[in-house]
Amino acid sequence: MRNLRAAAPASFLAPPAPPLLLPPSTPTPRGAFSAKASPAAAAAQAHGWCPSPRRVGRLRRRAGAASSSVASVEDAKKDVLVALSQIIDPDFGTDIVSCGFVKDLEISEALEEVSFRLELTTPACPIKDMFEEKANEVVAALPWVKKVNVTMSAQPARPAYAGELPEGLQKISNIIAVSSCKGGVGKSTVAVNLAYTLAGMGARVGIFDADVFGPSLPTMVSPENRLLVMNPESRSILPTEYLGVKMVSFGFAGQGRAIMRGPMVSGVINQLLTTTDWGELDYLVIDMPPGTGDIHLTLCQVAPLTAAVIVTTPQKLAFIDVAKGVRMFSKLKVPCVAVVENMCYFDADGKRFYPFGQGSGAQVVQQFGIPHLFDLPIRPTLSASGDTGIPEVVADPQGDVAKTFQNLGVCVVQQCAKIRQQVSTAVSYDRSIRAIRVKVPDSDEEFLLHPATVRRNDRSAQSVDEWTGEQKVQYGDIPEDIEPEEIRPMGNYAVSITWPDGFSQIAPYDQLEMLERLVDVPRATTAAVSS
């Protein structure tokens, strides 16, 4: 995985707040695990933080300074919650008690045994074992505790607006679109392997093949039941299943029409998606068809897409089409959280070759501010797995391709959790002072930008030649008094700004941080209005 920003910890488990979770003064190099280290400790150490004798000693000294007993159950519960509040979730930036993860806290009558449940945001948390180990450690350090019982669970699958959704979608927590406007770049390969990666991480997963004209799912997986069945009582479609993953495709509907007009196709997609009895799912992965047509609009109108994963190849033509897709998702208010560059390279004779060139995926990341980029090699087994009906991550779960998809799965899990917890827009326009207010995510910093400065620094192909870097839009082309008409967030990495001339600009947060800031702020003329 290539990350063009500082990498965030690959899980929902963060190094708890100082001083408890400070790493040792001489940390063990990454990958240099002790032979006696537990898998959870090894995973933590791989991320640069782990249980250390020094920290355990601090815990014991702290425990020795405290009372060896508590007066009541309520006092005991307070002690436990204070101890657990030392564990910080990196994505939400607060402790697990404030996040509401601690459930069913019970103290025995003898005030010696503690039981509680940690309810994570998703069962696919990549190092949930480390979370459990950390909770055991901090509670066991309390001087009056003799036994700790920790149970791990996940929040029930429920979208934010379940009551407003079709019945079939009301129990799905996250809907992920895997998309590329260009055909033949490997969307279906990425969608299927991502789905089985998430399932392998412990999530309940479904796949929806939204390509009516060329469904790929019946070829890429081989379920025993290859026909969709309708429940005669509820009139809902029962999805077929393979290795624990539910799936629906027009290819499983039997012999149907081969030629359909646009409205008919949209109706078929709507029916297949919304009348299917998906049950409770943590993630529904949608394999989007190529293009930016009626089907895409139908899907975004019917299903509340949580995020999109963009698939591309190194060729320039693929980049041009993918850029259209990213802008489509911007207008439909769907954040793009990762780019997968497929068929990127192959290794031979100890060397790495790039037969289709380099840079297309990186250009998408840089131009649109998408924080994560993943490279997939040209590999015969990856192609063959799509023909044999067994996904590559299932056939070779320890291989290099599976490791790349594991990193992609961690990214998707992490970004979806952040998106679902968003409570406010990070960027707004203050009409009273004619300035754009920017509050960077995960930071208390707020600053002001001149709207014309933001517009002049657009990185898109309309403003800058993506191959030569030549500026197309000149300084004088943008009036000083230009004002944005609308500002809306694109996940955790960028905002989409609509200008009076109809231009839609995608402005990554890291770009906004580097722009010249307003110092002499004009006096307010009217009441401030947030976009």
Curated annotation (Swiss-Prot):
GO terms for molecular function: 4 iron, 4 sulfur cluster binding; ATP binding; ATP-dependent FeS chaperone activity; metal ion binding. Pfam families: FeS_assembly_P, GBBH-like_N, ParA. Residues 1-62 form a transit peptide. Residues 17-37 are annotated as: Disordered. Keywords: ATP-binding, Chloroplast, Iron, Iron-sulfur, Metal-binding, Nucleotide-binding, Plastid, Transit peptide. ATP binds at C181, K182, G183, G184, V185, G186, K187, S188. Its cofactor is [4Fe-4S] cluster. Residues 28-37 have a biased composition (Low complexity). Required for photosystem I (PSI) biosynthesis and assembly. May serve as a chloroplast scaffold protein that specifically assembles iron-sulfur (4Fe-4S) clusters and transfers them to the chloroplast PSI and ferredoxin-thioredoxin (FTR) complexes. Probably not required for assembly or stability of plastidic 2Fe-2S clusters. This is Fe-S cluster assembly factor HCF101, chloroplastic. The gene is HCF101.
